[in-house]
């Protein structure tokens, strides 16, 4: 078995050792099948409700992918509202503090004082030929920015073999904050998909793809370099993720627990200005109006 892959029954010390070495671990079969099915069924109901509210007549009993794709064929924007709902639907909210997840978070962070980054909960629906929504090589810290040792939990709701585009990781790359460029227009025109880009190239073929099955859970370090996989199949890649940090990490406490991003604000400019190589190029709103 790969050094980053563990069964749910593995001892926590070994899991932590693998995590600290690689910046990522996969816990196989961590979530039971019944719970996953409940998550998927709630998801399917949300898709049906949104489609029908828009006057789209979906036949009863369609598989989740088919229902979602038919809705998006009429109006792709409806998929965005499904995403926004699913970020905080009941099955997601119940999972965030569940011991089935948090026992691993505590081991990886080395503390029981866990901060739940509720504003960093996401639901992804990655489809074929929609690479514009995929993220290139990045560190979650740029967006999350709670602490440098924060942990992301990524849960696939479906099997993610090679053709569905598993996440690609640069193992052991979690030792420093990478040099980045920020979108110099972020205070004027907010585009979350282009906020950050690496200032230093990554050799793509050094990355390791980590295929996963529904029920596996991936835990990744805030600084580990990774990128979205490209979905080349006809099936959709459904996944849920959230983030955690040490509540009493000195860096986090010193900034009053401020974190993340919001329109017109990137906290990494306050915490790690030396890592933003183009910070002198940022355009202020008043500059844009007088240009």
Say what each PLM segment does.
Residues 31-33, 123-124, 142, 160, ...:
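Short, solvent-exposed loop/turn segments at secondary-structure junctions
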Residues 5, 49, 53-58, 73, ...:
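Non-heme Fe(II)/2-oxoglutarate
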Residues 114, 139-146, 155-166, 172-174:
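Active-site region of the double-stranded beta-helix
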Residues 24, 148-152, 164, 207-209, ...:
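Extracellular structured ligand-interaction cores
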Residues 162-225:
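Double-stranded beta-helix
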Residues 1-21, 28-137, 143-144, 266:
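Non-heme Fe(II)-dependent double-stranded beta-helix
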Residues 137-140, 154-155, 204-206, 224-227:
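Glycine-rich, charged/polar anion/phosphate-binding loops
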Residues 145-162, 211-214, 219, 243-247:
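Short, conserved beta-strand element in jelly-roll/cupin
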């Amino acid at each position: 078995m790969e050094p980053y892959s563990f069964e749910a029954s593995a001892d926590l010390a070994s899991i932590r050792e693998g995590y600290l070495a690689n910046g990522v671990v996969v816990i196989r079969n961590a979530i039971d099948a019944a719970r996953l099915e409940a998550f998927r069924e709630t998801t399917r109901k949300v898709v049906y409700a949104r489609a029908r509210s828009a006057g789209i007549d979906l036949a009863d009993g369609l598989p989740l992918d088919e229902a979602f794709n038919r809705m998006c064929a009429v109006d792709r924007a409806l998929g965005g509202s499904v995403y926004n709902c699913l970020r905080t639907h009941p099955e997601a909210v119940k999972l965030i503090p569940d011991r089935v997840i948090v026992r691993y978070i505590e081991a990886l962070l080395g503390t029981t004082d866990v901060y739940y980054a509720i504003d960093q909960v996401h639901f992804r629906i990655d489809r074929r030929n929609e690479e514009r929504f995929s993220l290139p090589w990045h560190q979650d810290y740029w967006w999350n920015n709670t602490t440098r040792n924060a942990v992301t939990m990524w849960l696939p709701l479906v099997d993610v073999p090679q053709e569905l585009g598993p996440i690609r990781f640069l193992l052991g790359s979690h030792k420093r904050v990478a040099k980045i460029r920020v979108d110099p227009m972020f205070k004027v025109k907010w585009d979350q998909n282009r906020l950050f880009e690496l200032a230093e190239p990554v050799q793509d073929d050094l990355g390791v793809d980590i295929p996963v099955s529904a029920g596996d859970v991936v835990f990744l370090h805030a600084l580990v370099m990774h990128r979205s996989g490209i979905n080349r199949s006809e099936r959709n890649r459904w996944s849920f993720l959230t983030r955690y940090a040490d509540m009493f990490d000195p860096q986090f406490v010193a900034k009053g627990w401020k974190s993340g991003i919001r329109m017109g604000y990137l906290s990494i400019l306050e915490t790690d200005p030396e890592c933003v190589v183009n910070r002198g190029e940022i355009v202020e709103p008043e500059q844009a109006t007088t240009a």
